[in-house]
UniProtKB/Swiss-Prot annotation:
Other information: Overlaps HYP2.
Locations listed in the record: Membrane
GO cellular component terms attached to this protein's record: membrane
Protein's membrane topology: Single-pass membrane protein
Species name: Saccharomyces cerevisiae (strain ATCC 204508 / S288c)
Keywords, comma-separated and alphabetical: Membrane, Transmembrane, Transmembrane helix
Protein's UniProt name: Putative uncharacterized protein YEL034C-A
Length: 200
């Protein structure tokens, strides 16, 4: 009987240890770099949710017949990261940027780049087709896709020392959550609209 209880304890301890090691070791499903992106688990911070601590406290006490075994587990939290965005309290600033890139009908527009290293912040949209973006950066639409070298985007020539007046939300710069299929739809529409516009 004593050998059976030792075997049961050893089997139970190993299975729980494997479960916890697998849960903590494969924590990539607990982290994210933008939950809508297919590659959101790449190069993310290793995070463990707080429910694991309470689970560890529950798992540490095993009782077998009259044998009470208590395991000690140390939980160490390195750093907690939290992001809270309140849309009602964003600061609006006036824009007077004297060195920004625009797409304009006077320039050679949409030179296709075939290289892999394309940054999403190389060009602004400032055309009638995209007036709702208010000269917004390309990285508002494609920062994750372009910076991970997954697509090719046209690049317009730059106009330097062009002043622009308007309002912008500085807190949203570089944050725009859209799925990849919408990116492709937007760029197909933009490309067709720009091509028709240039042919006039």
């Amino acid at each position: 009987m004593e050998g059976a209880s030792e075997f049961f304890f050893l089997f139970s301890f190993i299975s729980h240890a494997m479960m916890l090691t697998g849960l903590i070791g494969s924590s990539s499903f607990l982290e994210g770099d933008g939950g809508f992106f297919t590659h959101s688990g790449d190069d993310g911070n290793h995070q463990v949710l707080t429910f694991i601590k309470s689970s560890l406290q529950t798992v540490t006490q095993f009782t077998f017949w009259s044998l009470d075994i208590i395991l000690s587990v140390t939980v160490h939290v390195h750093q907690r990261q939290e992001t809270v965005i309140n849309v009602q309290q964003l600061v609006f600033v006036s824009l007077d940027n004297w060195n920004f890139h625009v797409v304009s009908r006077w320039r050679q527009i949409f030179q296709l780049l075939t290289s892999e290293d394309i940054n999403g912040n190389q060009m602004d949209f400032s055309v009638t087709v995209l007036t709702s973006l208010r000269s917004g950066h390309v990285d508002n639409l494609t920062w994750s896709t372009l910076d991970d070298n997954e697509t090719v985007l046209s690049q317009g020539r730059t106009l330097h020392w062009v002043g622009g007046g308007g309002t912008s939300v500085s807190s949203f710069k570089g944050m725009f959550f859209v799925r990849h299929c919408i990116y492709e739809l937007v760029f197909v529409c933009v490309w067709e609209s720009m091509s028709n516009w240039l042919q006039k």
